[in-house]
Every structure is written in structure tokens, then in C-alpha cells.
């Protein structure tokens, strides 16, 4: 299963079990073929850091079983930054992101990635409106 980005409350995800559907936890977005290394590259572009440093901005919130799946929390530094983006900025960051090696290696159309980033920004804008919400990634490992 592809990773899923989900908007929700941390305490709700702490109760999630391996038998539960993560899509029922709140508004969500499938990452499709966009894996962790590619997301780290996006975070690096947003923050002006190395992708190795960007790994620190997505961390374990809850482990559903010994070998996963995992609920990862996306740091608010990332979500707050994305929440401020206007349409032209979304297009610009997507263009730069597509030129990075983890994204070049994926079999994904530029329009699909642009749509993903627009939807991600929308979730981040919703998150910014409600202090109790955060953005999580459901990752099977």
C-alpha cells in the first residue's frame, strides 16, 4: 500500500490498531509512488537543508505492530511552511522537487506530483486553522 498523508488528532492515532483503516481517521491523501526519501527531499527544499537533515521532520508517533505499520508525524515546521504557499509557489516548489534525484527515479507524471502538492498544501492550510490537528503519514514500512 502507498503511504497515506492524513489530517487528524494525535490522540486518535495513538488508539489506531493494525486492523483499523487509516483512511477513516480524517481527510487523507495517497502519496502514490512518492516514498519517504522523496518526501525528505521536499522538506529539504522547503527548509533549505540537506535531505539527511530533513529526515528529522517526519518522526514516529505510533507503531501499530512490531513490524509496522507506523504512524509518522510531520513536523509543524513543514506544515506551517506549506500552509503559507500560494499557487505560484506550489508550482515552483513542485518544479524544483521534480528535478531532485529521488523524484526523477520515480515513474510519475509532473501533473500528478503538482496535484499531490496542491492537495498537501490544502491539508496544511486546514491544519493551520485548528491547533488540535496535525499531519501524519501512515507508512507500512
Question: Which stretches of residues belong to each language-model region?
Answer:
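Acidic (Asp/Glu-rich) sequence patches and key acidic residues
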Residues: 1-130, 138-141
Amino acid at each position: 500500500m502507498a503511504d497515506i498523508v492524513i489530517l487528524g488528532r494525535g490522540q486518535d492515532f495513538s488508539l489506531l490498531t493494525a486492523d483499523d483503516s487509516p483512511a477513516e481517521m480524517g481527510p487523507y491523501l495517497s502519496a502514490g509512488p512518492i516514498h519517504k526519501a522523496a518526501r525528505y527531499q521536499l522538506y529539504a527544499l522547503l527548509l533549505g537543508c540537506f535531505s539527511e537533515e530533513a529526515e528529522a521532520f517526519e518522526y514516529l508517533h505510533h507503531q501499530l505492530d512490531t513490524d509496522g505499520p507506523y504512524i509518522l508525524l510531520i513536523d509543524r515546521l513543514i506544515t506551517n511552511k506549506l500552509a503559507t504557499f500560494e499557487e505560484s509557489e506550489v508550482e515552483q516548489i513542485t518544479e524544483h522537487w521534480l528535478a531532485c534525484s529521488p523524484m526523477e527515479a520515480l515513474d510519475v507524471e509532473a501533473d500528478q506530483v503538482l496535484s499531490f502538492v496542491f492537495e498537501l498544501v490544502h491539508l496544511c492550510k486546514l491544519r493551520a486553522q485548528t491547533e488540535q490537528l496535525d499531519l501524519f503519514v501512515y507508512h507500512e514500512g
